[in-house]
From Swiss-Prot:
Gene3D superfamilies: DD-peptidase/beta-lactamase superfamily. This is Protein flp. GO terms for cellular component: plasma membrane. Pfam families: Beta-lactamase (PF00144). It comes from Staphylococcus aureus (strain MSSA476). It is found in: Cell membrane. The lineage of its organism: Bacteria, Bacillati, Bacillota, Bacilli, Bacillales.
Length: 498
């Protein structure tokens, strides 16, 4: 390779690297944040302690506050035998946290005028009827939402898994005429069947399957691209393996399940996807604001339920602490989602074991992060030095301009025959050393998030850096590469003697 070609190759590589880094930084919006190492270690200690106490194989945990992701991280293993670590993309069965999607879908259909919350269930499910004290009773959609229909919580326990009754329509026929525990509207009794019936109403009103309607009208618009519904016990690449404890040892568990229970229990999702759901719940777009607020509104009193005053549309509520939340439990999975719309934060814990330590962990995180401890973020610390970063930006911009002027002048001199390219082995060696320096700098930059923060990569870090730091970083990188270009120009050119 000639010196001239090497020179132009060096310049091209440097320019391309600088431009690509600048574009990548600019295109990332400030939607996430990152806890400092000390804060991260404190959070990790709390999480790992509770997971260990509960013998939980793996969990993924999400914390969102003020529209930013404070934490989205996996702990332990999604598959213990294969040593596959849990991550934000690991999908778990979220059990009863499916109900909030079902409830919101019903409210949206009511808003559109396609049903009325005071409609009798039998209006949309013609064959449906149930009795109280031997007399037929009318149950409304609102009573299903509020869990006050009187339908027993164990109504399907004697026929838990059958092929015959494995569809929504079939199971409602199977319980038709059964006895209610309470007169509709009088008492709260939590029953999955309430939300399974709501799923059937969604199907009958929209003429779509429940899963297809939720996917088309909620999951896709919310960019929850990897969220699905359980169809079999087969596990794909990103699906967590469910476990049950035998003594203190988690063992793989694949219990049978009912497809008709999908609207109340069988969504499969990750903290990566739930980030969109949590942000939507806390800060909904204007056209959905009233709908989301309605879904958090109390519908029934829940006397006897721990930490809850009332039940809303797929959520428990605690008015004293302004909390909206729900737990989810299956034989081999558990989940907990907690929202505080007033203080604008949300916590999600997904685990591949049914464990009482999941709600305990959420409680600990809620107490530690919000009420007592002041956890610092990298962004909050960097924000204290905005003025200094602005000065760096000005200085680096000046250096870039000087480098540009010098390079342009050198190009003009070359065009008019006032400079020549140097040709020597020493120059070639220096050029290769310059290229090696560029590569070394690129590798250091690539590893910088890990060296400073202990994990994460640029794609994550660049989403939460304050704009002042982004500008300082962009200009510093371009100034660095511009300086290398100037060095190359000095190495490769000399002024002709007149």
């Amino acid at each position: 390779m000639t010196t001239k070609k090497l020179y132009f190759l060096s310049i091209s590589i440097i320019i391309l690297v600088a431009i690509s880094i600048a574009i990548h930084i600019t295109l990332n919006s400030n939607t996430k944040t990152r806890l400092t190492n000390d804060s991260q270690q404190q959070i990790d200690t709390i999480i790992e302690h509770d997971l260990q106490k509960g013998h939980i194989p793996g969990a993924s945990i999400l914390i969102v506050k003020n529209g930013k992701v404070f934490l989205n991280k996996g702990y332990g293993y999604q598959d213990v035998d294969k040593k596959v670590k849990a991550s934000p993309t690991t999908k778990y069965e979220i059990a009863s946290n499916t109900k909030a999607f079902t409830g919101l879908a019903i409210l949206k259909l009511a808003q559109e005028g396609r049903l009325n919350l005071n409609d009798a269930v039998s209006k949309h499910v013609p064959h449906f009827k149930m009795n109280y004290n031997g007399q037929n009773e009318t149950i409304t959609i609102k009573q299903l939402l509020a869990q006050t229909s009187g339908i027993p919580s164990d109504i399907t326990s004697e026929d838990a898994v059958t092929n015959k009754n494995n569809r929504l329509n079939d199971v409602t026929r199977a319980i038709m005429g059964d006895e209610l525990h309470h007169k509709p509207g009088e008492e709260f009794e939590y029953s999955n069947m309430n939300y399974d019936l709501l799923g059937l109403i969604i199907q009958n009103v929209t003429k779509q399957s429940y899963t297809q309607y939720i996917t088309d009208h909620w999951l896709k618009p919310l960019q929850m691209k990897h969220t699905t519904f359980k169809q079999t016990n087969y596990k794909s690449k990103h699906d967590a393996i469910g476990y049950e404890l035998q003594g203190s040892t988690p063992v793989v568990s694949k219990p049978e399940f009912n497809l008709w229970d999908t609207p109340s229990a069988y969504m499969m999702t990750s903290t990566e996807d739930l980030e969109h759901w949590i942000k939507f719940q806390l800060n909904p777009p204007d056209k959905y604001k009233s709908l989301v607020q309605q879904s958090h509104k109390n519908l029934s009193s829940t006397i006897g339920e721990p930490n809850a005053n009332a039940y809303a549309s797929g959520w428990f509520t605690n008015n004293d602490e302004h909390l909206v939340f729900h737990s989810g439990t299956l034989d081999n999975f558990s989940s907990f989602i907690l929202l505080n719309p007033k203080q604008n934060y949300g916590i999600v814990v997904l685990a591949n074991l049914n464990s009482e330590y999941v709600p305990k962990l959420v409680e600990h995180l809620n107490t530690q992060i919000v009420n007592h401890k002041r956890y610092s973020t990298v962004a909050s610390i960097l924000n204290q030095y905005k003025d200094q970063f602005n000065i760096v930006t000005v200085l680096m911009t000046t250096l870039i301009l000087l480098a540009f002027i010098f390079s342009a002048y050198r190009a003009w001199q070359m065009r008019h025959g006032q400079i020549l390219l140097r040709r020597s082995k020493r120059i070639a060696v220096l050029s290769w050393l310059t290229l090696c320096l560029c590569i070394a700098i690129a590798l250091i930059l690539y590893a910088l998030p890990y060296l400073i923060l202990g994990s994460n990569n640029w794609s994550f870090v660049l989403t939460w850096l304050p704009i002042e730091i982004k500008l300082a970083l962009i200009t510093t990188l371009i100034a660095l590469f511009s300086t290398l270009i100037v060095i190359l120009l000095f190495l490769h050119t000399k002024i002709t003697k007149t």
